[in-house]
Amino acid sequence: MTQWYPASPALWQGRDDSIEAPDARRLFQAITRSEAFSPENWQQKIALMGFACDEGVKRNAGRPGAAGGPDALRKALANMASHQGHERLVDLGNWVAPTPDLEGAQQALRDAVSRCLRAGMRTLVLGGGHETAFGHGAGVLDAFAQESVGIINLDAHLDLRQTDRATSGTPFRQLAQLCDAQSRAFHYACFGVSRAANTQALWREAQWRNVTVVEDLDCHDALAQMTQFIDKVDKIYLTIDLDVLPVWEMPAVSAPAALGVPLIQVLRLIDPVCRSGKLQAADLVEFNPRFDEDGAAARVAARLGWQIAHWWR
């Protein structure tokens, strides 16, 4: 059974510069850490949650270790400077999945996300493998059952694989099937896709599903496509698989990208998403601290989380 645990206060530590000025604060001083999973007490805040699960990565024959991602990313975030928006962050702890119950873990995350959104919070989830996306996305669909939900994925992979059980490579096929079951449109856009990392069958599935696909080679000039997608939906779920970044910026993932989309381009793409007023949920997935020798990759990932919270409108 998937268990919930509050985040350890030891994760939120950093340098105290407050003697210099009242606004010389860092995230560890701005964030609120909750000892209970009580989203109803935190309306209009951003729920920071961890999904400590990499069973989907294991099933997908990837490199395990992403279950340690949430706490590693908290440590990297803690000492970053606090600016506008960061005071809204409330750490609502980790969902920890016992191997091999991926389906139970995804259901627990789904219920938690739906509860947060219905309570008036927004959700920022730290994975975990990209199996995070099915639980997170399903929770968003549940919470906004009468509205059109757009799923924006920055990823080298389409993650539309067809297998006999859920993996880190199946979340968007699962979400498509959930939309089918609910008789609602499946709005999915994937930016940063590597043609070399996706089979022809996956491209065919994406075409059949009317997925908006932008390859890694074209992301330098994709703002118009991003804006068009934002305009056609009511609510947005943003998911960032860190393997969208080039290996020289992000080696600490299951499948590092030989080409990838540089961090500066990723930030430019998500800027209008965060400022759109439609973003309800976001996550960072696939960070694997086992392959981060000096903490540099954690800082890259943390900058994305920091920027999302700062820009979020």
Swiss-Prot record:
Enzyme class: hydrolase
Necessary cofactors: Mn(2+)
Pfam families: Arginase (PF00491)
Residues annotated to bind Mn(2+) 1: H130, D155, D159, D241
Binding-site residues, Mn(2+) 2: D155, H157, D241, D243
Pathway where this protein functions: Amino-acid degradation; L-histidine degradation into L-glutamate; L-glutamate from N-formimidoyl-L-glutamate (hydrolase route): step 1/1
Sorted UniProt keywords: Histidine metabolism, Hydrolase, Manganese, Metal-binding
Disulfide bridge positions per record: none
Single annotated GO MF: formimidoylglutamase activity
Gene3D superfamilies documented for this protein: Ureohydrolase domain (3.40.800.10)
UniProt GO BP: L-histidine catabolic process to glutamate and formamide; L-histidine catabolic process to glutamate and formate; putrescine biosynthetic process from arginine, via agmatine
Substrates-to-products reaction catalysed: N-formimidoyl-L-glutamate + H2O = formamide + L-glutamate
Cofactor-binding details, from the entry: Binds 2 manganese ions per subunit.
EC number(s) stated in the UniProt entry for this protein: 3.5.3.8
Family as reported in the entry's similarity comment: Belongs to the arginase family.
Job description of the protein: Catalyzes the conversion of N-formimidoyl-L-glutamate to L-glutamate and formamide.
Annotated protein name in UniProt: Formimidoylglutamase
Provenance organism: Salmonella paratyphi A (strain AKU_12601)
